[in-house]
Amino acid sequence: MLIFPLINDTSRKIIHIDMDAFFASVEERDNPSLKGKPVIIGSDPRKTGGRGVVSTCNYEARKFGVHSAMSSKEAYERCPQAIFISGNYQKYRQVGMEVRDIFKKYTDLVEPMSIDEAYLDVTENKMGIKSAVKLAKMIQYDIWNDVHLTCSAGISYNKFLAKLASDFEKPKGLTLILPDQAQDFLKPLPIEKFHGVGKRSVEKLHALGVYTGEDLLSLSEISLIDMFGRFGYDLYRKARGINASPVKPDRVRKSIGSEKTYGKLLYNEADIKAEISKNVQRVVASLEKNKKVGKTIVLKVRYADFETLTKRMTLEEYTQDFQIIDQVAKAIFDTLEESVFGIRLLGVTVTTLENEHEAIYLDF
């Protein structure tokens, strides 16, 4: 018996656009000499005493096992010939807005998930074109022609499947999952590839002998809800390719943060980083409590002279993992110029939030 009715609307046409290695691709576009070389966006460990973290990297660097949130030191060890670029996030945001303007030519139902990806509902669209595949190809062409960057497109009847489709073939991919193809696509898929299924849920499912979509399909809704609570309801539907979540235009992103003002100024690096970790602990606790994950980490520092600095780093993957957020926040601190003034305030904030079980986890 189903606790919640199965409603599977297969009439929608949803496109998920994911820019290919976005930050690194922008750098390659603006500096053609980088093409064909491994490029890492992050602090160069040779200039920071081994400190720093990878924000993202291009596909050449990924061949060496480099990935987002890896320490810059490990990335260098894996790929010593890589070119490290600190990143220009203002430029990336501007390019991201240019891409978003292209989306708006086709539909107003655009839901940005981050600076480099978005869902588009093209069931009804400004072009009056019925084929979502044709629209996706037109969008890819416009992005290449206007912004000189490539993207991958996933097309299906809901957001869950459209995202899986865009991940299926990268870069420059275009994958369509029709309603009668969903089960064949999902059955062999490793459970960790189901976006919205985090590391702890994967471990719990593996312990139950669930490794693929087909394994998940064999479990009843009641048993999944018993084991996972409300998330069991979502898992039951994911296994069947069901997702009723609408495309929400320009959804406002909130943030979760923690900051503290110190009566006694902080000067010692070890003390400062210990306080950063305390802020991160509070942020992670709040993320877990609110079942949120995020992909942009912001560090705020206020000195004794009241100069306030705010710097951020955006990762490719959503996270609520303490170690990743802590490592990134400290890596941001390492990029700040030393000040003769002590620190009176430290803050850590995670933005670009998504519900834990709707978030995207990498990798018609």
From Swiss-Prot:
Primary enzyme class: transferase
Pfam families: IMS, IMS_C, IMS_HHH
Superkingdom, taxonomy of origin: Bacteria
GO BP annotations listed: DNA-templated DNA replication; error-prone translesion synthesis; SOS response
Binding site for Mg(2+): D18, D116
CDD domains referenced in this protein's UniProt entry, alphabetically: PolY_Pol_IV_kappa (cd03586)
Domain UmuC: 14-198
Substrates-to-products reaction catalysed: DNA(n) + a 2'-deoxyribonucleoside 5'-triphosphate = DNA(n+1) + diphosphate
Chain positions of site Substrate discrimination: F23
Cofactor binding note from Swiss-Prot or TrEMBL: Binds 2 magnesium ions per subunit.
Keyword hit for Membrane: no
Molecular function terms, GO-annotated: damaged DNA binding; DNA-directed DNA polymerase activity; magnesium ion binding
UniProt EC number: 2.7.7.7
NCBIfam families recorded: PRK02406.1 (NF002677), PRK14133.1 (NF010731)
PANTHER family: DNA POLYMERASE KAPPA, DNA REPAIR POLYMERASE UMUC / TRANSFERASE FAMILY MEMBER
Subunit structure: Monomer.
Family as reported in the entry's similarity comment: Belongs to the DNA polymerase type-Y family.
Protein name: DNA polymerase IV
Native organism: Streptococcus agalactiae serotype V (strain ATCC BAA-611 / 2603 V/R)
Gene: dinB
